[in-house]
């Protein structure tokens, strides 16, 4: 099914998983990753709306789970970033723990978009997030954000290495795609994956 993402609108912000809408109605895809990994920017690029989600250069700015509705019953979930360095260890891991709870409990979750800064890939909490998703058979699509920050040659080499490392690490194929809001890398692939999941 092909969705019209440019009409996506803000639905609600909630502080916890138990506050989310009834999971028996509709389908969801969640955007997760470290603080400042580009989750909000990716949603804005996907929907062709520069201000749909608040983008901040300050890590840890988002502290609520933000829901956006593509069409009735079709939702994108923007989770706060995990691992913000200036937080205590407990707070650094807090949103990762919430995401793991969400993965286990949310029956209408169709897939996980994991944002990873291509310059700092597969950090500890990213690895644990992927493992949690795979353990409950939730597909993962990894977007290597900020790909415009490195040269094209380095981009190709780095992308291949990340794909190889993830295959060895998780013993399965994880979809990986370079992504850049500035140079429009990966937006078409993101739409394709979402349309496949949300049908």
Swiss-Prot record:
Keywords: Cell cycle, Cell division, GTP-binding, Magnesium, Metal-binding, Nucleotide-binding, Septation
Gene Ontology cellular component annotations, sorted alphabetically: cytosol
Entry-linked InterPro entries: G_ENGB_dom (IPR030393), GTP-bd (IPR006073), GTP-bd_ribosome_bio_YsxC (IPR019987), P-loop_NTPase (IPR027417)
Superkingdom of the organism of origin: Bacteria
Residues annotated as domain EngB-type G: 25-199
Residues reported in the UniProt entry to bind Mg(2+): 40, 62
GO MF terms, alphabetically ordered: GTP binding; metal ion binding
Gene3D superfamilies according to UniProt: P-loop containing nucleotide triphosphate hydrolases (3.40.50.300)
Cofactor (UniProt): Mg(2+)
Gene Ontology terms describing biological process: division septum assembly
PROSITE patterns reported for this sequence: G_ENGB (PS51706)
Coiled coil: none
NCBIfam families per the UniProt record, alphabetical: GTPase_YsxC
Biological role: Necessary for normal cell division and for the maintenance of normal septation.
Family note: Belongs to the TRAFAC class TrmE-Era-EngA-EngB-Septin-like GTPase superfamily. EngB GTPase family.
Protein name (database record): Probable GTP-binding protein EngB
Originating organism: Blochmanniella pennsylvanica (strain BPEN)
Organism lineage: Bacteria, Pseudomonadati, Pseudomonadota, Gammaproteobacteria, Enterobacterales
């Amino acid at each position: 099914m092909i969705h019209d993402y440019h009409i996506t609108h803000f639905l609600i912000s909630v502080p916890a998983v138990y506050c989310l809408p009834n999971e028996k109605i509709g389908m969801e895809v969640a955007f997760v990753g470290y603080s400042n990994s580009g989750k909000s920017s990716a949603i804005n690029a996907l929907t062709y709306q520069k201000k749909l989600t608040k983008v901040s250069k300050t890590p840890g700015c988002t502290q609520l789970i933000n829901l956006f509705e593509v069409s009735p019953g079709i939702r994108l979930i923007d989770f706060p970033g995990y691992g913000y360095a200036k937080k205590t260890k407990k707070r650094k891991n807090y949103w990762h723990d919430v995401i793991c709870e969400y993965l286990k409990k949310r029956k209408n979750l169709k897939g996980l978009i994991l944002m990873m800064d291509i310059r700092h890939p597969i950090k500890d909490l990213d690895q644990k997030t992927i493992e949690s998703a795979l353990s409950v058979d939730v597909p993962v699509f990894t977007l290597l954000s900020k790909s415009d920050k490195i040269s094209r040659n380095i981009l190709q080499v780095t992308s291949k290495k990340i794909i190889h490392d993830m295959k060895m690490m998780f013993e399965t194929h994880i979809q990986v795609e370079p992504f850049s809001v500035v140079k429009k890398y990966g937006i078409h692939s993101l739409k394709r994956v979402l349309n496949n999941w949300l049908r």
